[in-house]
Amino acid sequence: MTLFHFGNCFSLAYFPYFITYKCSGLSEYNAFWRCVQAGATYLFVRLCKMLFLATFFPTWEGGAGVYDFVGEFMKATVDMADLLGLHLVMSRNAGKGEYKIMVAAMGWATAELIMSRCIPLWVGARGIEFDWKYIQMSFDSNISLVHYIAMAAVVWMFTRYDLPKSFRLPVAILLGLCVYKGFLMELFVHVFLLGSWTALLVKAVLTGAISLCSLFLFVTLVHSN
């Protein structure tokens, strides 16, 4: 039963990545090693972020239940390094915009999935007692995939030299939402005392809204050129 539960969680977490890779056409471009390189860039960026946070933002030692608003906001600002990393990956790949976006997003999201959720699923989902948090973790990995695709698309649009002036403000707002989405979610959970399933639903809705706006801007920009 525990192995069956682990199989369900593993399939729910990993198969959407495999399906996205196959259906997006990346397999036809032999982009596997490009995605691996993007994943390696993610690991380097994450290491730099961890060193920076450990050096300049030590562990919060405030009272129980006290939310360090300024500290968490500054920590979230460090996630701007992800924007630089995605831009670096896309600038090193030749091809159409959608190809660059998918390579960067797939490599980035897959590396995060392996580093953040592989071991917890392997250790926890095979436990004797059933726990919904591993199902939630699997759903969250799918949300992260959508998030990174949207983020890569926004970064690609923001770095275009021919970006129309009317697009600059919406794209900048989307960049800010991509960077501070995690901070906003933590703030919502703390203020409104959201449960785990409610927080996951809010995160999915917020990610979906950002993704739809990014898709609309991307399609409009591509067709206008």
Swiss-Prot record:
Keywords, in A-Z order:
Cell membrane, Endoplasmic reticulum, Membrane, Transmembrane, Transmembrane helix
What's the protein's topology in the membrane? Multi-pass membrane protein
Topology Lumenal: residue spans = 59-68, 127-131, 190-196
Membrane-crossing residue ranges in chain numbering: 1-21, 35-58, 69-90, 101-126, 132-157, 167-189, 197-218
Cytoplasmic side residue ranges read: 22-34, 91-100, 158-166, 219-225
Location of this chain's protein in the cell: Endoplasmic reticulum membrane; Cell membrane
A GO molecular function term, named singly, is:
ribosome binding
* One of the GO biological process terms: protein localization to nuclear inner membrane
Under the cellular component aspect of Gene Ontology, which terms does the record hold? Answer: endoplasmic reticulum membrane; nuclear membrane; plasma membrane
What's this protein's family per the entry? Answer: Belongs to the TMEM147 family.
Q: What is the protein's quaternary organization? A: Component of the multi-pass translocon (MPT) complex.
- Function field: Component of the multi-pass translocon (MPT) complex that mediates insertion of multi-pass membrane proteins into the lipid bilayer of membranes. The MPT complex takes over after the SEC61 complex: following membrane insertion of the first few transmembrane segments of proteins by the SEC61 complex, the MPT complex occludes the lateral gate of the SEC61 complex to promote insertion of subsequent transmembrane regions.
PANTHER family for the chain: BOS COMPLEX SUBUNIT TMEM147, SMALL SEVEN TRANSMEMBRANE DOMAIN-CONTAINING PROTEIN
Protein name per the record: BOS complex subunit TMEM147
Q: Which organism is it from?
A: Danio rerio (Zebrafish)
Q: What is the lineage of its organism?
A: Eukaryota, Metazoa, Chordata, Craniata, Vertebrata
Which gene does this sequence derive from? tmem147
